[in-house]
Regions:
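Beta-rich, blade/repeat-based domains predominating
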Residues: 1-15, 48-64, 96-111, 119-122, ...
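Beta-propeller fold detector
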Residues: 1, 39-47, 86-94, 142-150, ...
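Conserved beta-strand positions in repeat-built beta-propeller and related beta-rich domains
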Residues: 11-13, 19-26, 60-62, 67-73, ...
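Short loop/turn segments immediately following beta-strands, especially the blade-tip
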Residues: 31-38, 77-85, 133-141, 181-190, ...
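Intrinsic low-complexity tandem-repeat regions in disordered proteins
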Residues: 15-16, 41-42, 65, 88-89, ...
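Blade-level signature of beta-propeller repeat domains, shared across WD40, Kelch, NHL, RCC1
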Residues: 205-246
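A detector of repeated loop/turn-to-beta-strand junctions in beta-rich toroidal repeat architectures
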Residues: 25-27, 39, 72-74, 86, ...
Length: 246
């Protein structure tokens, strides 16, 4: 049941489970953290009621026991214990959301918000990249609390998203060759607070992204380089490293 298009695998650290999107099977596969070899998933969310069609990425909220799936003009939310042909417990979507092509999502369970990496459509049909920030439990046709978008934002083909709650920061891979970092309080046409990579950097087509705050590290996988790169950025993670040193 595994395939080549699973770009947003996530891990539920509270339950020690690996949660995997399966685009071709229109399914979510949940494996035990200890799974190895040809192992069956412990649960599979799949079927006509799920509304899953072409999922590429997902995100796990371990604190509240939920799975978030960006699916085009909507974000589907499932219970982590769901199994079989089950409907989402919430669906975020509609004209008021401002997006038509959601590709990634991340959850901040501390602030009770989600960040959706998406595009809106301009009057002439162009895609307008954005990071839309919603209440975590938002459902239906609702407006975002804030939207980062515009020329100064430098958003372009957003990949995976990670949130660092302690610092109030959101990290995104930009597949044009860099990682961008904003404050979760940013709104409108604002530039990133920090960037990793760029025109003279090593990154070419970053996809995967993770954070290791204890070691001040931003970890990026690059499709073009076929490599995983680790950047030390203590200026971003000072609060947690200072506390750990006490």
């Amino acid at each position: 049941m595994l395939g080549r298009t699973m770009h947003g695998i996530d891990y539920d650290e509270r339950r020690d489970e690996i949660v995997v999107p399966q685009q071709f099977g229109q399914a979510i596969l949940i494996f035990k953290g200890s799974a190895a070899g040809e192992t069956r998933p412990v649960r599979v969310i799949q079927g006509s009621r799920t509304m899953l069609t072409a999922l590429d990425r997902l995100a796990v909220d371990s604190v509240n026991g939920e799975i978030y799936v960006p699916e085009g003009d909507r974000v589907l939310v499932f219970d982590l214990q769901a199994n079989g042909n089950v409907a989402p417990k919430r669906v975020l979507g509609g004209p008021e959301t401002g997006f038509t092509a959601a590709g990634s999502v991340a959850i901040d369970a501390t602030r009770n918000i989600i960040v959706v990496g998406a595009e809106a459509r301009s009057a002439d049909g162009r895609g307008l990249p954005q990071l839309a920030i919603f209440d975590r439990t938002a459902a239906g046709n609702v407006k975002p609390r804030r939207v980062i978008t515009g020329v100064n934002s430098r958003l372009n083909d957003t990949g995976n998203i990670r949130i660092y709650p302690e610092g109030g920061l959101v990290f995104t891979t930009q597949q044009t060759g860099y990682v961008a970092v904003w404050s979760l309080d940013d709104d409108g046409d604002v530039p990133p607070r920090y960037t990793v990579g760029g025109p003279n950097g090593l990154l070419q087509k970053p996809r995967g992204l993770d954070l290791d705050p204890r070691h001040n590290a931003v970890i990026v996988s690059d499709k073009q380089l076929n490599a995983v790169l680790t950047y030390e950025m203590p200026q971003l993670f000072q609060p947690i490293t200072s506390q750990a040193a006490k």
